[in-house]
């Protein structure tokens, strides 16, 4: 989505920037094959989570993808998880990434830590979780707006705290088909698929030596 971006200059070398040539090559690769690449690729390269106390206690995140089919109805989600808060599994509620202790031996609870800030507090504001859902259902622009709104429930299920003044979250919805589906079913399914994509972003992310500045990802610490 060309109208949205994440702030990732605090991770790795801030002088490394994407170019028009990189964008052109990314489009060519996207159309050339069907392999899905997730984790630290594309917009997920510098994504991190758990940044209530800045980058030193954060963890690596990335780009996540998920898709499901219900008969002939298809729904896919893609998300870059670059959140202030902690990340939780949509299946069992277990924390899978987030704010680390100062010695990085365990997790801190971002919500509990946030409750310490009784007076106005400058937070690490470089946070944006950007997601999109794409379906083959036949929906109007107004209906897609509603589906995008329902998809946001996935953020609340998987990210806590979420929608803070330090977050700049966005969700987009697009229709590329003509399958007739109830909008309530579609929006509910979109939230489920987005939650899976958020989890996928965490599980497939890993640190890259050339970009090392902050914390390991869950994949590197297992």
What are the roles of these predicted feature ranges?
Residues 78-79, 83-127, 131, 135-139:
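Glycine- and Gly-Pro-enriched alpha-helical subdomains that act as flexible
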Residues 131-166, 180-187:
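Hydrophobic alpha-helical bundle architecture
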Residues 161-179, 200-209:
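Basic polyanion-binding and macromolecular-assembly surfaces
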Residues 186-194, 199-201:
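Helix-rich interaction surfaces within compact, conserved domain-sized segments
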Residues 213-222:
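Single conserved hydrophobic/aromatic residue that forms the stacking wall/gate
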């Amino acid at each position: 989505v060309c109208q949205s971006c994440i702030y990732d200059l605090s991770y790795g070398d801030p002088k490394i920037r994407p170019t028009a040539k990189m964008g052109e090559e990314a489009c060519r690769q996207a159309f050339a094959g069907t392999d899905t690449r997730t984790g630290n690729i594309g917009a997920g390269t510098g994504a991190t989570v758990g940044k209530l106390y800045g980058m030193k206690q954060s963890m690596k995140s990335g780009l996540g993808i998920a898709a499901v089919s219900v008969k002939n109805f298809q729904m896919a989600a893609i998300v870059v998880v670059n959140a202030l808060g902690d990340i939780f599994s949509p299946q069992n509620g277990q924390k899978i990434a987030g704010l680390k202790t100062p010695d990085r031996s365990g997790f801190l609870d971002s919500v509990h830590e946030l409750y310490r800030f009784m007076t106005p507090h400058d937070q690490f504001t470089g946070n944006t979780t950007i997601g999109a859902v794409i379906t083959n259902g036949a929906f109007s622009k107004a209906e897609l707006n509603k589906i995008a709104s329902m998809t946001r429930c996935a953020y609340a299920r998987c990210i806590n705290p979420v929608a803070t003044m330090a977050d700049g979250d966005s969700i987009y919805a697009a229709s590329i088909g003509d399958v007739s589906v109830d909008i309530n079913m579609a929006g509910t399914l979109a939230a489920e698929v987005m939650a899976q994509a958020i989890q996928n972003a965490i599980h497939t992310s890993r640190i890259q030596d050339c970009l090392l500045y902050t914390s390991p990802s869950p994949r590197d610490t297992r």
